[in-house]
Amino acid sequence: MACLKLQAVTKSYDGVTPVIKQIDLDVADGEFIVMVGPSGCGKSTLLRMVAGLERTTTGDIYIGDQRVTDLEPKDRGIAMVFQNYVLYPHMNVFDNMAYGLKIRGFGKEQIRQRVDEAARILELQPLLKRKPRELSGGQRQRVAMGRAIVREPAVFLFDEPLSNLDAKLRVQMRLELQQLHRRLKTTSLYVTHDQVEAMTLAQRVIVMNKGVAEQIGTPSEVYKRPASLFVASFIGSPAMNLLDGTVSPDGRTFILSDGLTLPLEIPQPQWGGRRLTLGIRPEHIQQTTSAQGVPMNLLTLELLGADNLAHGLWGGQSIIARLSHEEMPVAGSTLHLYLPPAALHFFDTDSGLRIEP
């Protein structure tokens, strides 16, 4: 095992347009880090630079105490698991897992021991003689992981390994990945576009946007204290409600575009007259009496089973409130909503950055 360090790493293909803007990252020995973001945000490019499949434009990459920036992938002590399983169809499970060791000159007994141990960890012992066509998607992905495990790498790199699996199997494989990491305690860098994978697997999350690491933190930090409008809108399902408006001169109300005012129970006079974006998560909005709440005309109600989502508009801007499964107001009715002051987030509308009271 080893730590992973990225030092002022950047990437540009034409020398002008940055694909990855400067990123510094320290991954502790045994830590599981997940990079999450939309397509084209640079997360896979960054992973490929760590793997040695892409060259950095500037900066250095260290695995343990060794600078690996200019080393070939085979010399970096890494193992990758891809979205596609890349199994040899004519080989059985044992030979697929053993192949990388064979071409590196390992002895038969050493290969057998490593494959048997990986198969035990992944519960693949009964499948070692089967061909890939005889396996389910989840079993094939476990074989791909086994092929990485037998290398005993310093760092695991995962490139969207669950994307080809159906929803039920993804849940199962997420649990298996968590258990696998607890057993092996190998430093891991994992890429996904799925925020559920990021939040459930990661010890720390890197939220990527247009080549920038918008926020690096624990899943709880990223969810509870998003550093920017992008993070607030990307992490969470449904996303955080974001309302553009202006703080009143006395700092006691937040005024939306149509003149609707939202009370600020904790006045913010330092922001008086300033254009801001107010954020609140759907689950933090509460139903209350008409005297205490802000009215919202219910446009539609989504019934999700465990809870319900009430959709409406405030000042021409969408608002979603998460209700209990027992609350089933009728479309067209008026809800009165309360915004707890401790649940409010504020962002500078122009820069998109979080601001603190």
Swiss-Prot record:
ATP binds at residues 37-44. GO terms for biological process: carbohydrate transport; glycerol-3-phosphate transmembrane transport; glycerophosphodiester transmembrane transport. InterPro entries: AAA+_ATPase, ABC_transporter-like_ATP-bd, ABC_transporter-like_CS, ABC_transpr_MalK-like, ABC_transpr_MalK/UgpC-like, Mo/tungstate-bd_C_term_dom, NA-bd_OB-fold, OB_MalK-like. PANTHER family: MALTODEXTRIN IMPORT ATP-BINDING PROTEIN MSMX (PTHR43875), SN-GLYCEROL-3-PHOSPHATE IMPORT ATP-BINDING PROTEIN UGPC (PTHR43875:SF12). It is found in: Cell inner membrane. Keywords: ATP-binding, Cell inner membrane, Cell membrane, Membrane, Nucleotide-binding, Sugar transport, Translocase, Transport. Residues 4-235 form the ABC transporter domain. The gene is ugpC. This is sn-glycerol-3-phosphate import ATP-binding protein UgpC. It catalyses: sn-glycerol 3-phosphate(out) + ATP + H2O = sn-glycerol 3-phosphate(in) + ADP + phosphate + H(+).
